[in-house]
Amino acid sequence: MRFTDAHAPGPLCHLSRYGLMTGTYPFRTDISVWPTKPVIQEKEDTIAKLLSRQGYQTAMVGKWHLGFRETGYDNPLPGGPVDQGFQSYFGIRASTDIPPYFYIRGDKAVMPPTDEIGDNATDGWSPIQGEFWRAGGISPDLKLDRVLPRLTAEAIEVIKNRDEEKPLML
């Protein structure tokens, strides 16, 4: 797939992600606020479902931020990427400023957020100052300043371990 002229369907990350995943303008739905529950309906088609039906291997690595049905950290987290056509997923439920912070593999928490992290914001904080996060639960295996390198390593593993007989959508 080659994108030569792309436009964001919404002004926020989850709105653009919803538009990319479903092909639907986000203003045609009720997802204008930060999602906590799944915003893609179970029967709604997604780019991952479409490509899977065409024989693609589909994997997602990164921030989902389209909601999960959170049922506890020891249970599956339905409504995420593996329920929307991705054959594998590794990532985080929202951005690194929205606790609780924990990695998800497939539809399960890798490690529950049993620790706490303090807020690192200061008065007058601006993006020029660097990383920002809010206080909340965090899993012992997640370091907020190491999320991007971890996601990069996971994406590299997907590429290395792909089925070379099938096209890959990552």
List PLM regions with ranges.
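Formylglycine-dependent sulfatase
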Residues: 1-170
